[in-house]
Amino acid sequence: MNATALLDTISIEQISQFLYSEARFLDDEQWDDWLECYAPQASFWMPAWDDNDQLTENPQTEISLIYYPDRQGLEDRVFRIKTERSSATMPDTRTAHNISNIEVESRDGLQITVRFNWNTLSFRYKNSYSYFGMSRYVIDFSGEQPKILSKYVMLKNDYINQVIDIYHI
């Protein structure tokens, strides 16, 4: 099948199923499967809101809530979670990710930019928390499995009373 024909076969349903799988891997703490959703060069960025209530624009020069320039940073984070070397994740946090309003913003060959809203419910220390926002992914569909090339997360309720981590969003 040529690339043009393959592009025409990538449906919003397939994109949605990929996004749902990534969320499920977080909810089920299937860390290795979750990492497999990401290309080696994948960036992961959640900018912070500045004092003027504007999002920061450069992860290299401004503060971010989370920033990993490539998958290696995610691998290190997962290693710490799995080996209980992260006090921020002890005890385990139970999560339920919900995704809505999935929209294809652009297609560039087999790379598709997707925007969606999300809400994550979290339970830890006998307390429930809710996080919500918008994410924009660039996903490469050229291989056997789709891979995230870029994950941008806008956390819309950033006044929180605990550490935010990769599994909250």
UniProtKB/Swiss-Prot annotation:
Q: Which NCBIfam families match?
A: benzo_1_2_benB (TIGR03232)
Q: Give the species this sequence originates from.
A: Acinetobacter baylyi (strain ATCC 33305 / BD413 / ADP1)
| Quaternary state and interactors | This dioxygenase system consists of three proteins: the two subunits of the hydroxylase (BenA and BenB), and an electron transfer component (BenC).
What is the similarity comment for this entry? Answer: Belongs to the bacterial ring-hydroxylating dioxygenase beta subunit family.
Q: What is the lineage of its organism?
A: Bacteria, Pseudomonadati, Pseudomonadota, Gammaproteobacteria, Moraxellales
Lineage, top-rank taxon, reads: Bacteria
Name the chemical reaction catalysed here. Answer: benzoate + NADH + O2 + H(+) = (1R,6S)-1,6-dihydroxycyclohexa-2,4-diene-1-carboxylate + NAD(+)
Broadest EC class? oxidoreductase
Q: Which UniProt keywords apply?
A: Aromatic hydrocarbons catabolism, Dioxygenase, NAD, Oxidoreductase
GO terms of molecular function: benzoate 1,2-dioxygenase activity
The protein's matches in Pfam families, at most eight in alphabetical order, are given as: Ring_hydroxyl_B
Q: What is this protein called in UniProt? A: Benzoate 1,2-dioxygenase subunit beta
Name the pathway.
Answer: Aromatic compound metabolism; benzoate degradation via hydroxylation; catechol from benzoate: step 1/2
